[in-house]
């Protein structure tokens, strides 16, 4: 019905959507950072050493990207992304707004010769947000192949502020569904609660 009314569903995806594809959850990345980058984390408290944003904030952008890219290169397309790709292609989904850096949904779309526009809101200027068409994939915190990733607490807080109006308009104008997003690893969840 929403498709017929011109209000396709907006899907928000988090790490849980990519877990069965082989991508780690935030707490698994934190454990990996604590193991591989101990010297980077010396200034953190024990509590901070368990926090995704705090740990990522102690890595250089190159270290962050290398850590994530290693997992993306091994990730397999899963059924969740195949289903999302099919619904996106047929217009039942307006946009997929993802917190994930991976390209699994793009790869799933390509299985059906569907190549949706993909936007990286970490680097895209706010003036273009309203021009993002339906049947697109939107990376809210950047994409692994992009120039910037929102990983640290400071980065995600700044990104949440940048996305404030875009998220408000999106949430208030379309039905939405959250898949695999816990809300615990970034400042974005406050925007959802506000709207």
Please place each PLM-identified region on the residue numbering.
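Conserved catalytic-core helix/loop/strand module for nucleotide-ribose chemistry
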Residues: 1-175, 181-195
């Amino acid at each position: 019905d929403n498709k017929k009314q011109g209000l396709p569903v907006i899907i928000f995806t988090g790490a849980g959507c990519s877990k069965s594809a082989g991508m780690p959850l935030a707490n698994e990345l934190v454990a990996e950072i604590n193991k591989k980058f101990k010297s980077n984390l010396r200034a953190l408290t024990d509590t901070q050493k368990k926090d995704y944003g705090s740990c990522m904030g102690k890595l250089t952008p190159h270290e962050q990207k290398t850590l994530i890219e290693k997992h993306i290169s091994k990730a397999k397309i899963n059924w969740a992304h195949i289903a999302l790709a099919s619904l996106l292609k047929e217009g039942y989904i307006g946009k997929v707004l993802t917190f994930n850096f991976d390209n699994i949904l793009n790869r799933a779309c390509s299985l059906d010769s569907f190549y949706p526009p993909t936007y990286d809101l970490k680097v895209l200027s706010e003036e273009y947000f309203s021009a993002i068409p339906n049947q697109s994939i939107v990376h809210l915190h950047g994409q692994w192949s992009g120039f910037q990733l929102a990983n640290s607490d400071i980065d995600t807080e700044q990104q949440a502020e940048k996305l404030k109006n875009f998220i408000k308009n999106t949430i208030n104008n379309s039905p939405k569904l959250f898949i695999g997003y816990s809300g615990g690893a970034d400042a974005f969840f406050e925007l959802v609660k506000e709207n």
